[in-house]
Amino acid sequence: MKLAVYGKGGIGKSTTSCNISVALAKRGKKVLQIGCDPKHDSTFTLTGFLIPTIIDTLQEKDYHYEDVWAEDVIYKGYGGVDCVEAGGPPAGAGCGGYVVGETVKLLKELNAFDEYDVILFDVLGDVVCGGFAAPLNYADYCMIVTDNGFDALFAANRIAASVREKARTHPLRLAGLIGNRTAKRDLIEKYVDAVPMPILEVLPLIEDIRVSRVKGKTLFEMAESDPSLNYVCDYYLNIADQILANPEGVVPKDAADRDLFSLLSDFYLNPQQPKTAEEELDLMMV
């Protein structure tokens, strides 16, 4: 099974991806997480350090693919999750999407794709150009990380459009949305009413999720010394269980940008007023 995780930049995709990878491993699956971001920090919370990238390794080998071995580019992370970072070109030069393609090419030559039960692509930001949409060409499911805000849902809608486009050529499905560190879910639900898709999970505003990123640890590793965090791990285990159940998923019908802008803007400009005590009493008497 191959998964691709997308979402607005800074929304918490890498933290979410790492914890989902560990959750899948705890369900007995052999997991490979591939970071597809020039920052090459996707797997930081799994390994505790910034691992060398595939591009770094290829440069050292003068791009002789035959001289690269699996142990040169695949690093063992927490919970037995294997980790790869694609890396990227120097800032302001080259195409990061091309690097993603080269990463997939190398891993295929190393037969890495055949050794894992689950491969998870953690893809940068909300960039959905052809290059960074490349992981969708290999994925069975896409998951979109969002919060209860305007910008994240606007980005989610653009990603949904990419899923719809890629689904024309192979059996890709959108598994659903993951709400990350959000105190409310009303705007998420308003979006889903307009653009039907599953909500896999909504994680509350838990400070330890943010702290885990700084510590370079998954919530599962933190919970080993602080069992009070086990309830946070359950959110990720729930997502893993849903994915392993091979959900039907959807081919999303994204909203037009202007329609979505109006829908989400209206939520802020014309908020629903809470019912008064008298109105609540009237409802109870009906």
From Swiss-Prot:
Question: What is the catalytic activity of this protein?
Answer: chlorophyllide a + oxidized 2[4Fe-4S]-[ferredoxin] + 2 ADP + 2 phosphate = protochlorophyllide a + reduced 2[4Fe-4S]-[ferredoxin] + 2 ATP + 2 H2O
Q: Which residues form the signal peptide?
A: none
Q: In which pathway does it act?
A: Porphyrin-containing compound metabolism; chlorophyll biosynthesis (light-independent)
**Statement: the UniProt record of this protein carries the keyword Iron:** yes
Note describing how the cofactor binds: Binds 1 [4Fe-4S] cluster per dimer.
Family named by the database record: Belongs to the NifH/BchL/ChlL family.
Q: What is this protein called?
A: Light-independent protochlorophyllide reductase iron-sulfur ATP-binding protein
Q: Which organism is it from?
A: Leptolyngbya boryana (Plectonema boryanum)
